């Protein structure tokens, strides 16, 4: 048996630069991880089946699950003769902008690499994972990074300054492809990636909070105004900075002090079913 944790990610910044010939957007984003984790265990099987065990019936256990597809890809890549049972203890909200599915897929690639003693490097696993998900390369490493291209080009950055993170997911799901289809590249939107990069270089917490920006946020807010209300609630309740992560709908707030973080948590806990008080990992 092999055990892996799969931490959630948040975006400090997210920008889309242009539409590529392959249909994807060229992106530029800075991401980090928080200590909200899915936990996965892996067992070899005597047959060649891939079995995903998960308690939540709203999470698929077939080829629609990224962990299943990662296992399928890994077994094909390394021509394995055995299947695997993957048990997922899910804590990261689904369709939330926190890369829960990608984190599980990355954990699966790392876990199977150990389970079958393949000895592949993290770089090799990241390249393999990029075939099925743009956030998977980042999730292979779980380090604060600037991600460009489709997300597969990674430059590691300093860990962010220590801070509390309040995550709040409204009771709705958002499809990332649907949001990306609505991007208007002719419409100006300032994303402060350079400012964020410098803030992390200098471990400047205040500058980091000022740099939080996401080009997808106004698009998701136009469809779901409660996202903006949630963000404003966090800021009014004392968050040093707040932002929608990914394509949403999860909003997070940053706080240096535990008492400050608990105040924000209590302020938003009544309006969202899923609220978490966690720490930055990076």
Swiss-Prot record:
Binding site for ATP: 93-103
EC number: 2.7.1.148
A UniProt-annotated Pfam family: GHMP_kinases_N
Coiled-coil boundaries: none
Gene Ontology terms for molecular function: 4-(cytidine 5'-diphospho)-2-C-methyl-D-erythritol kinase activity; ATP binding
Active-site residue list: 9, 135
GO biological process: terpenoid biosynthetic process
Assigned protein family: Belongs to the GHMP kinase family. IspE subfamily.
NCBIfam families linked to this entry: ispE
Main function: Catalyzes the phosphorylation of the position 2 hydroxy group of 4-diphosphocytidyl-2C-methyl-D-erythritol.
Protein name, entry field: Putative 4-diphosphocytidyl-2-C-methyl-D-erythritol kinase
Species of origin: Staphylococcus aureus (strain NCTC 8325 / PS 47)
